[in-house]
């Protein structure tokens, strides 16, 4: 039973780290990356559809994304969806391809993005600590039911704390890498 609690905590913490990594990937740096447009939904026959389902997103060069839309009647809708997103991008269409030049980030915008990234990292840390709290309370419940000893509880709590420290360290490493990426000119 204790092993199940530990494994569950470990997998949930790993999911928290992965979710934090995915949230940080959405933050725009100076470099073009297809995942930048993952959050954009395009109205397709009245249904909000992810951009990658209506077109192929690729990197043209380090500061330009290109979208090849599958259905040419969707070009205007894709452009409108990109412009109305909070990414601050200005698409240009050329035939069946939409090019999106990424403007260079200003120093002020970089600092704002670093604040956003730090907030995401803190949310990830909080999620990991919540998993730790849940796991520790599950172990204490086992002790109350006399299914394990006090020594088992202490040992398990120490192991769960080690998992927590390791996963928070991963989040901190992701944060450091993202901050360095944002500060690159």
UniProtKB/Swiss-Prot annotation:
Keywords: Cytoplasm, Protein biosynthesis. GO terms for cellular component: cytosol. The keyword Protein biosynthesis applies. It is found in: Cytoplasm. Its main location: cytoplasm. The keyword Protein biosynthesis applies. It comes from the Bacteria. InterPro entries: Ribosome_recyc_fac, Ribosome_recyc_fac_dom, RRF_sf. GO terms for biological process: cytoplasmic translational termination. GO terms for molecular function: ribosomal large subunit binding. Responsible for the release of ribosomes from messenger RNA at the termination of protein biosynthesis. May increase the efficiency of translation by recycling ribosomes from one round of translation to another. PANTHER family: MITOCHONDRIAL RIBOSOME RECYCLING FACTOR PSEUDO 1, RIBOSOME RECYCLING FACTOR. Belongs to the RRF family. HAMAP family: RRF. NCBIfam families: frr. This is Ribosome-recycling factor. It comes from Shewanella loihica (strain ATCC BAA-1088 / PV-4). The gene is frr.
């Amino acid at each position: 039973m204790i092993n199940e609690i530990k494994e569950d905590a470990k997998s949930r913490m790993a999911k928290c780290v992965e979710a934090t990594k995915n949230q940080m990937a959405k933050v725009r740096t100076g470099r073009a990356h297809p995942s930048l447009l993952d959050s954009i939904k395009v109205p397709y026959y009245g249904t909000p559809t992810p951009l990658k389902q209506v077109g192929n997103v690729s990197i043209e060069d380090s500061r330009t994304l290109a979208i090849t839309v599958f259905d040419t009647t969707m070009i205007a809708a894709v452009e409108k969806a990109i412009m109305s997103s909070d990414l601050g991008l200005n698409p240009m269409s050329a035939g069946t391809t939409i090019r999106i030049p990424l403007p260079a980030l200003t120093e002020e915008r970089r600092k704002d993005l670093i604040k956003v990234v730090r907030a995401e990292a803190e949310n990830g840390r909080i999620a990991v600590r919540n998993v730790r709290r849940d796991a520790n309370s599950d172990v204490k419940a086992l002790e109350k039911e006399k299914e394990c000893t006090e020594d088992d509880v202490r040992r398990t709590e120490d192991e769960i704390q080690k998992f927590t420290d390791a996963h928070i360290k991963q989040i901190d490493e992701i944060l450091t890498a993202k901050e360095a990426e944002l500060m690159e000119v």
